[in-house]
């Protein structure tokens, strides 16, 4: 998804998207591990783009869902290589309510370093709630947001939507 359907937004910001094989939008821990091992085993890796984060979506654009076991395996690979796991939660409300998933919000917080809870696809006017698991918010995060022109004046009002969506389980 992020490699082709976001108009190059990641690369526009100066980062490089390195793809691994996908299967209906999902990646496998084994493929990820092979990709990372290949990178680190290459004697010239110091001259290459370093893998800096793993990005997954739940549900994917194909509607496929990760299982708890898959999420745990991918997280384990990320932690063994000391790179964060990011979960795109634009459709997270739908994924958590699916009868086909065994993934819960606490599991996502346990296995992912960063994720966001999408709002617009579940009834919010706009916005996503970014969650840094385990109190790992980057240093000076608010300043970084402002430097990139993404800090909205009175933006805290958008948070009220999420407070409401989490009341009486309206989010899912």
Q: What do the predicted segments below correspond to?
A:
Residues 60, 91-93, 121:
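Active-site-proximal loop/turn and secondary-structure-junction residues that shape catalytic pockets
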Residues 66-98:
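Catalytic PLP-binding core of fold-type I/II PLP enzymes
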Residues 50-58, 65, 103-171:
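Active-site C-terminal subdomain of aminotransferase-like
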Residues 34, 69-80, 103, 107-110, ...:
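Alpha-helical scaffolding segments of alpha/beta enzyme cores, especially the outer helices
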Residues 1-4, 33:
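Conserved PLP-anchoring active-site segment centered on the Schiff-base-forming lysine
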Residues 14-52, 56-59, 66-73:
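PLP-dependent aminotransferase-class I/II
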Residues 5-15:
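Active-site-proximal loop->helix
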């Amino acid at each position: 998804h992020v490699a082709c359907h976001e108009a190059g937004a990641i690369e526009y910001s100066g980062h490089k998207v390195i793809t691994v094989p996908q299967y209906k939008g999902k990646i496998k821990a084994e493929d990820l591990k092979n990709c990372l091992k290949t990178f680190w085993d290459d004697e010239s890796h110091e001259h290459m783009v370093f893998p800096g984060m793993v990005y997954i979506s739940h549900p994917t654009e194909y509607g496929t869902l990760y299982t708890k076991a898959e999420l745990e395996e991918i997280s384990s690979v990320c932690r063994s290589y000391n790179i964060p796991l990011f979960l795109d939660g634009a459709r997270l409300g739908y994924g958590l309510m699916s009868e086909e998933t065994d993934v819960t919000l606490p599991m996502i917080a346990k296995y992912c370093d960063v994720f966001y809870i999408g709002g617009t696809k579940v009834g919010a006017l706009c916005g996503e709630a970014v969650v840094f698991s385990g109190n790992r918010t980057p240093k000076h995060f608010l300043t970084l947001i402002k430097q990139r022109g993404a800090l909205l004046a009175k933006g805290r009002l958008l948070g009220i939507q999420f407070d409401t969506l989490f009341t009486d389980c309206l989010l899912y």
